[in-house]
């Protein structure tokens, strides 16, 4: 085991603070409408230019191991806030730095670190209550657009795109962000349920020009096994043929003989049919087939449920107003499933999302939820250069997460104003001793830091602005974009309550841990051995 170096008390905390300051100073320049860009070097390809706080934080590794420990702990604040709220990473970093700087001064002056932490925790709980009280619901398209605009660094086109996407697929719908092909931003919306499996034979195509199959008001058969014998399908095919309607078959697979029979019957016009493979794999496939069955009102034909294909009849088929099948995708629009059954299925998926352990599982469940509850919207980001594309995609992603957070927990006045207004909740709050009272006072001062940083980045005098905002009430604040004061909500400068709350809680939590640190342990780097002396060249004397 390698030898370790141990630092204690003030020396350890000073090193840790140096690391925190290095990381926070790089991150906080991005805050606010006049925040600056940070250029990140990449081991291959062009450097990345970004205004996304968490992207900057993730790139920073310091040479000094003790300073690096401090930087990594604050990096945790940024990434945790991003995970929970999707935005607010820079605000969280600024708050953590402000709290830690003042907290370590207090410890150096002889105050008890544990009491300081208790005071900070007590004040944080009170501030969170006040933020929730200040919060207003965010449900109308205008508020959603404003939140998206602010989070995308005052880019109104991004705010409008997100508001349009939410209006079309609902607040539960899946909205994804992709790199577009052109210079303009685009919004593509897929209504109904779409899955990535196309027809099993191009001979099912009804539109030969663009090779699609359009089925109006079709019956839908959903099976979780391979169909190899056409006899198993005869009762269903006869019933569908008599009705004069089309049939969509979704099965694990349809083997060659059965597929050939279906194709021939389709081409002769005996029965209009299209067969597609079931989406997904394993247990996820069964779950998705059950989703489709619920959406269309079909009975899921599965031997696990004691249902055999040969026993299937017309009663077991579902319907939809329209189905479109291409070589790659199948879209079911306006399924005829019962609203109650669909709502019940949605609640089951929501419960599974809450219990999911991995991001992958959670993402797949979210996709299933969206397909059942509304649809999928894809925002395609356009830009002139690849560097601009990456930077813009990061901003749109942030804005999307912030908007979802706003819909979930509501909105407060932006630009750091909500934290200033929440200060009044600390009036009269006292701890059990003077050191706890100092912890409360520390947080009262630290929550001014985001507003101060926004003003500094805009080239203003932070103390003047903070005093002006404090002297007024309600949503009155400072608009750094055009250097004016006024009602932040009316000016469309809003922050999601969840983002502000998460930033505050994570910053206070990490600062409390770092203030109470008394020792740091790191490995001692072994000096690399000197290079061996080169041997003499053949036929020549050795070099001296």
From Swiss-Prot:
GO cellular component terms listed in the entry, alphabetical order: cytoplasm
Annotated EC: 5.6.1.7
Keyword terms of this UniProt record: ATP-binding, Chaperone, Cytoplasm, Isomerase, Nucleotide-binding
Family label: Belongs to the chaperonin (HSP60) family.
Subunit-level organization: Forms a cylinder of 14 subunits composed of two heptameric rings stacked back-to-back. Interacts with the co-chaperonin GroES.
Subcellular location: Cytoplasm
Organism name: Francisella tularensis subsp. novicida (strain U112)
Reaction(s) catalysed by this chain's protein: ATP + H2O + a folded polypeptide = ADP + phosphate + an unfolded polypeptide
Source organism, top-level taxon: Bacteria
CDD domains: GroEL
Residues at which ATP binds: 30-33, 51, 87-91, 415, 479-481, 495
Role of this protein: Together with its co-chaperonin GroES, plays an essential role in assisting protein folding. The GroEL-GroES system forms a nano-cage that allows encapsulation of the non-native substrate proteins and provides a physical environment optimized to promote and accelerate protein folding.
GO biological process: protein refolding
Enzyme class: isomerase
Name the UniProt record assigns to this protein: Chaperonin GroEL
GO molecular function annotation: ATP binding; ATP-dependent protein folding chaperone; isomerase activity; unfolded protein binding
Chain's gene name: groEL
UniProt-listed NCBIfam families: GroEL (TIGR02348), PRK00013.1 (NF000592), PRK12849.1 (NF009487), PRK12850.1 (NF009488), PRK12851.1 (NF009489)
